[in-house]
């Protein structure tokens, strides 16, 4: 898998860009909001990527952050959601608003995305809420507080920290959100839900 591209921006279209890396031009599908925020052609850009492999075509999708790519990949796991629809959701809502909508079970905000009807919105809610609860990482959550944010002490808190990191948040962002919770006696899933609500409201 091509994890990211760093190269010269050649062309910008409403929903795609061309990036030159090592003399090769890569056409990358991106949300319109990202395309509009990129610098002028000729400047260097950095995009996290996902390569979709089909029998008839290869398509690359680009994101400004690992957090957005994580949300895109989770959406791809929902039945009936393809890469272009997943990209539209991430581009229209943004990852933090998406997580907050899922936790509030707000299907209305999802149906504002072209191509997402009520049934698809409900399916996303059910499947992603379950995945958010079960998301795990294969790294230790007990990371040093080198950024000045206190390390969390409880087991549930560290499990929640690991889950938030696996969703694409930085250790600092995750610890800050968990440290802001008024109720720290929840289980790991409860802590994750509460922290996502805080970050989704920012």
From Swiss-Prot:
GO molecular function, one term: ATP binding
GO CC list: cytoplasm; Holliday junction helicase complex; Holliday junction resolvase complex
Cross-referenced SMART domains: HhH1
Chain intervals for the UniProt region annotation (Domain II): 65-143
SUPFAM superfamilies, alphabetized: DNA helicase RuvA subunit, C-terminal domain (SSF46929), Nucleic acid-binding proteins (SSF50249), RuvA domain 2-like (SSF47781)
Gene3D superfamilies: 5' to 3' exonuclease, C-terminal subdomain (1.10.150.20), DNA helicase RuvA subunit, C-terminal domain (1.10.8.10), Nucleic acid-binding proteins (2.40.50.140)
Flexible linker: annotated span: 144-152
Function per UniProt: The RuvA-RuvB-RuvC complex processes Holliday junction (HJ) DNA during genetic recombination and DNA repair, while the RuvA-RuvB complex plays an important role in the rescue of blocked DNA replication forks via replication fork reversal (RFR). RuvA specifically binds to HJ cruciform DNA, conferring on it an open structure. The RuvB hexamer acts as an ATP-dependent pump, pulling dsDNA into and through the RuvAB complex. HJ branch migration allows RuvC to scan DNA until it finds its consensus sequence, where it cleaves and resolves the cruciform DNA.
Protein name listed in UniProt: Holliday junction branch migration complex subunit RuvA
Species of the source: Desulforudis audaxviator (strain MP104C)
Gene: ruvA
